[in-house]
Amino acid sequence: MESLSRAMVHYLRHNPNAPLDDAAYTSVNHIFEIFNINRCTLDNIINLPTDKQRLFLSPCHNFIRAASGHSRPVQLHLLGSPITSPSSVKYCTHGTTRKSLTLIEKEGLQKMRRHYIHFAKNKTSVKKGSDVIITLDVPKYLRAGMKLYRLDDGNIAASGNRDNVIKPIYFL
């Protein structure tokens, strides 16, 4: 089940031929065909006990998408809800490597090959292999007019400034 779940997530995130709408959803019927599964199997995959929820069904349960990490552009406001109150964010950190830290401290966090800058919702959500944690000053960031979104999986995403960068002045 776990390998099928990972294959579905990879397909929904990265397959350029996957028929996704602006919110990155595709029909569950399409998934049934592509992966030769039925509704019961899909429900079992969605409900796998894991520390990271990677797949989401639409409210009507007829569409499915990967939580985040898409290779093609997806409208951030359609992947989650805007965060307007700093008090609603308990944990907003970005995991990185010590090797990358010097450049980040100088230039800021960049989206790199992704479409958005991702932040973890808790310690277990921090990117594997991270040996440095950068914490975002959420009140200062929001006061500056920058936008944060809580994704469906609970993690947080930001586009940064017009250059897609979060400057070090917003780090704690």
Where do the model's predicted regions map?
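Conserved NAD+-utilizing ADP-ribose enzyme module
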Residues: 1-117, 123-172
